[in-house]
A protein has these predicted regions:
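Short helix-capping segments at alpha-helix termini
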Residues: 91-92, 141, 206-213, 236-238, ...
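N-terminal helix-turn-helix DNA-binding module of bacterial transcription factors
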Residues: 1-64
């Protein structure tokens, strides 16, 4: 049997006050006598009244809800970003609604429209790439949009990111202290972060270190552990003795693949990865990583 929904009217009637008074108590308004406040709170507790968040949102023009679009909720990097967003949202008494897009352009648009239809106060869009379709969708909304994990090459949409060019240059220079052949293992180069920012940082570091750039040392792959594992033999065959890897799960796969093929890491092969997610602490040896915000 369905339980009857308790409304603000029920609380007001039971407490013998107006609905406006109940609303003031619920919203923490101090302009209520303490005896009245206590009486209303007692009724709220007894009836197990829970304010309707949707109705409150319509009245205040705010839902205190932030939508979060994530490309792969199983990916440790994006999962850690989502956790961080939730921690901050909780601090400010906001809720988050997470939708998984699977990194698919069509599904991204669907989940974005679904979240915006729920009148979220803003949207955090986590992705590897920003497609023209999703950019066009964002241009039509008045809701605040912030990117994380992706950058807008046109600098029209704000993002929370590091300087990928500088970071990649710094770690490549660090590896260049002990290595002559350094590989770059990156996600799809069509993504601006990889094909533009990280690649340019990698090339700049090689030039500064007096090393020759070779396309044969640039490996394009997908963002997954199996992809890194599969890539290990090719990286080994290239003659590289170090690698800058742009995804932690790929880095762990590469590490295990190299170890399985008899390579001693880090004695014979050094790896620096990019996201500093928790899985970098679980490997043996542990992986050095670029720190993300």
């Amino acid at each position: 049997m369905e339980s009857e929904t308790i409304t603000i009217y029920d609380v007001a009637r039971e407490a013998g006050v107006s609905m406006a008074t109940v609303s003031r108590v619920v919203n923490g308004n101090q302009n209520v006598k303490e005896t009245t406040r206590r009486k209303v709170l007692d009724v709220i507790e007894r009836l197990d009244y829970r304010p309707n968040a949707v109705a409150r949102g319509l009245a205040s023009k705010k839902t205190t809800t932030v939508g979060v679009v994530i490309p792969d909720i199983a990916n440790s990097y994006f999962a850690s970003l989502a956790r961080g967003i939730d921690d901050i949202a909780t601090m400010y008494k906001y809720n988050i609604v997470i939708a998984n897009s699977d990194g698919d352009d069509g599904k991204e648009i669907n989940v974005v429209n679904t979240l915006l239809a729920k009148q979220v106060d803003g949207l955090v869009f986590l992705a590897h790439n920003l497609s023209d379709k999703i950019r066009a969708e964002f241009s039509r909304t008045r809701s605040p949009i912030v990117l994380a994990g992706a950058v807008d090459p046109e600098d029209q949409i704000p993002s929370v990111n590091i300087d990928y060019t500088v970071a990649t240059k710094e770690v490549t220079l660090e590896l260049a202290k002990n290595n002559q052949k350094i590989a770059l293992v990156a996600g799809p180069m069509v993504n601006a972060i990889n094909g533009k920012e990280r690649l340019s940082g990698y090339q700049a570091a090689l030039a500064e270190a007096g090393l020759t750039f070779s396309e044969g040392l640039v490996f394009e792959t997908t963002y997954s552990y199996p992809a890194g594992l599969k890539l290990a033999e090719r990286v080994k065959a290239s003659g590289a003795t170090a690698a800058v890897v742009t995804d932690d799960e790929v880095a762990v796969g590469l590490l295990n693949g190299l170890v399985n093929s008899g390579v001693n890491v880090p004695e014979d092969f050094e790896i620096i990865t990019a996201n500093n997610s928790v899985i970098t602490e679980f490997t043996r040896p542990t992986l050095s990583s670029i720190e993300q915000p």
